[in-house]
């Protein structure tokens, strides 16, 4: 509990003890009134003050006004204990609500704890000066000690360490980083001293963008929240006028038309009971709190949601479209097979790696990585790169060619046809065919499991879009269990394909696009819900996406959908429960069957139950 909550708790205890003690005292008349006013003012002075300020500001019809009128009316009718009890239990409900919001905020603030307090700038004499991260310019060298947060995005110039990214990704496994590696702000340096050259200003760094996104999430309200806001705007004045009519019309009818005693006191008490029952706190508080808790729970799982409207849309997702490279595959080319004739595997890889040693092409890098030994460029001469075909060179005086079938055709070398899916590098040594090396993009470890999990979530169709060859795309789709694949697409074709799918789906069905944030901004924006995966350090993805998954695990997609559906389920549970109980109690109150104690349950009891139910949205670990 914070200080404010502790003060309210003490007031509740004091007022409750005084109310019980006074109920046992044999006092009556003015003395009883004066004595009961003590616990009433102890517990309710702030509500009365808020109600008075609301009247002065012409914002009359709110829960404070309802509570003030109902309790003052009960006291004026001589029901002192009921008047104090209504205010007492209302404050208990408010305390529960405050605690629930605080718990949700703590989840968000744990994420907010990634905000760095300072940056260490190294002076010319070698000493360190602590400055505000906003003051650090691009290209500055900052020093990050063990245990400190990385304040600004940059590249490591000196040092090696393990980085704790759990606050950003929800994953506890540390990430190794050394010289030349990019580091993002918000990570915690676990071991060595790092010197980092900044590549961004603090305002443009990853941590700043994430914090800005989370802080603004509450401004984007869902359809349910907007409905409740409009509902409360008209509902509260309506029940106030209804209570007034209940207090005046039945007694007048009894007096003027039926010739009976009006029984003003009984009907006024019914009207006050009606007011207490009608207080919309359970709805007005629990619905936004459910979404707030859902966003907080999601952030702890490494899923950042930009607003409750996106959480609501995600829960209705029936079509999921994936970009292939970097989303379902790792986007890293690796040698997946070596098929040789007379030459052994290691010698073939050595020739290929040396022939490609001067190239920075991803395929060249994968060949050098597969060979795995130091390369001596001095062994290589007469290097000639043939654009779109491959490379020829002399390795230790031996003519080596590495490339596609077109290169082999140019050289007059008959090559073996390869039916495996991937990029084929044919090898010719000394004018003779020596074999081929197969290079492919590796599928992510949990990709197949992720597709199965989506189908289990009720997703009707999964679609993959890629610029790869038809055969390669088809094999990946079949291996993963993806329903539909569109290949050989240019970036603009992906937008057109998503628009076509949007036209085909049902009106209430939503389409989500999942990309890695690289060149995906137009498609992320066009889909009903844009999900950027592994978006750490990708400004475009954080900007364009509605939901950001902070690591590369495709299983997080189905988890995000389950979180959204749990949150929406809780929202509807609270709506049906609160409205159902209130309608029943309002009817019973108007008929004089439900007394003030029943009204207390219909207001405070329902609010406490709804708030406790809303807190469940925080618990996402088992989803």
Indicate residue ranges for each PLM-predicted region:
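N-terminal membrane topogenic signal
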Residues: 1-14, 235
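Bilayer-spanning, highly hydrophobic alpha-helical transmembrane segments
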Residues: 14-16, 227-258, 270-291, 572-601
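Actuator/coupling domain of P-type ATPases
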Residues: 22-23, 29-31, 36-122, 135-142, ...
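Juxtamembrane helix-loop transition segments at the membrane interface in multi-pass membrane proteins
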Residues: 52-60, 99-109, 289-308, 617-623
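Conserved catalytic phosphorylation-site environment of P-type ATPases
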Residues: 66-68, 168, 269, 279-355, ...
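Membrane-embedded transport module
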Residues: 242, 503-508, 545, 550-623
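P-type ATPase nucleotide-binding
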Residues: 335-461, 470, 482-498
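Conserved ATP-binding TGD loop and adjacent catalytic N/P-domain core of P-type ATPases
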Residues: 397, 423, 429-573, 581
């Amino acid at each position: 509990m914070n200080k404010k909550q502790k003060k309210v708790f003490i007031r509740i205890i004091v007022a409750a003890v005084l109310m019980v003690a006074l109920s046992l005292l044999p006092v009556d008349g003015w003395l009883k009134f004066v004595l009961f006013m003590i616990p009433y003012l102890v517990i309710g002075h702030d509500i009365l003050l808020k109600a008075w300020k609301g009247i002065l500001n012409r914002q009359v019809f709110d829960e404070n006004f309802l509570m003030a009128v109902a309790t003052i009316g009960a006291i004026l009718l001589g029901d002192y204990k009921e008047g104090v009890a209504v205010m007492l239990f209302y404050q208990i409900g408010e305390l529960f609500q405050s605690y629930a919001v605080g718990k949700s905020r703590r989840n968000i603030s744990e994420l907010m704890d990634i905000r760095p307090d300072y940056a260490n700038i190294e002076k010319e004499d070698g000493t360190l000066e602590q400055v505000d991260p906003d003051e650090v310019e691009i290209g500055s060298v900052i020093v990050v000690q063990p245990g400190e947060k990385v304040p600004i995005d940059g590249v490591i110039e000196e040092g090696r360490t393990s980085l704790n990214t759990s606050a950003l990704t929800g994953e506890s496994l540390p990430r190794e980083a050394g010289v030349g590696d990019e580091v993002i702000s918000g990570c915690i340096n676990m071991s060595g001293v790092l010197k980092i050259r900044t590549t961004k200003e603090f305002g443009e760094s990853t941590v700043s963008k994430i914090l800005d996104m989370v802080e603004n999430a509450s401004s984007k309200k869902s359809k349910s929240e907007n409905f409740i806001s409009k509902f409360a705007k008209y509902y509260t004045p309506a029940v106030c006028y209804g209570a007034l009519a209940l207090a005046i019309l039945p007694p007048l009818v009894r007096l003027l038309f039926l010739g009976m005693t009006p029984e003003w006191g009984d009907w006024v008490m019914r009207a006050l009971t009606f007011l207490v029952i009608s207080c919309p706190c359970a709805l007005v508080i629990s619905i936004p709190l459910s979404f707030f808790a859902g966003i907080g729970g999601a952030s702890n799982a490494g899923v950042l949601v930009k607003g409750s409207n996106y959480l609501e849309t995600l829960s209705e997702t029936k079509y999921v479209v994936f970009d292939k490279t970097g989303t379902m595959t790792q986007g890293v080319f690796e040698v997946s097979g070596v098929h040789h004739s007379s030459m052994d595997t290691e010698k073939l890889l050595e020739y290929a790696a040396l022939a490609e040693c001067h190239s920075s092409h991803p395929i060249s890098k994968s060949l050098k990585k597969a060979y795995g030994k130091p390369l001596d460029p001095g062994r290589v001469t007469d290097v000639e790169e043939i654009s779109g075909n491959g490379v020829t060179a002399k390795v230790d005086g031996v003519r080596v060619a590495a490339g596609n079938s077109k290169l082999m055709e140019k050289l007059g070398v008959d090559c073996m046809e390869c039916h495996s899916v991937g990029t084929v590098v044919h090898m010719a040594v000394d004018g003779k065919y020596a074999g081929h090396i197969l290079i492919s993009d590796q599928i992510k470890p949990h990709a197949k499991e992720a597709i199965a999990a989506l189908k289990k979530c009720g997703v009707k169709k999964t679609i993959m879009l890629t610029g790869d060859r038809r055969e390669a795309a088809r094999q990946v789709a079949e291996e993963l269990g993806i329903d539909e694949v569109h290949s050989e697409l240019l970036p603009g074709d992906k937008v057109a394909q998503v628009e076509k799918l949007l036209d085909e789906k049902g009106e209430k069905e939503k389409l989500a696009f999942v990309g890695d944030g690289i060149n995906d901004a137009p498609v992320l924006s066009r889909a009903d819900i844009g999900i950027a995966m592994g978006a750490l350090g990708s400004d475009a993805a954080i900007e364009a996406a509605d939901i950001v998954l902070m690591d590369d695990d495709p299983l997080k997609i189905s988890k995000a959908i389950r979180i959204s559906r749990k949150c929406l389920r809780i929202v509807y549970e609270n709506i049906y429960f609160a409205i159902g109980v209130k309608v029943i109690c309002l009817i019973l109150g108007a008929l004089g069957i439900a007394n003030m104690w029943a009204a207390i349950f219909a207001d405070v009891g329902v609010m406490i139950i709804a708030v406790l139910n809303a807190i469940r949205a925080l618990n996402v670990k088992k989803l």
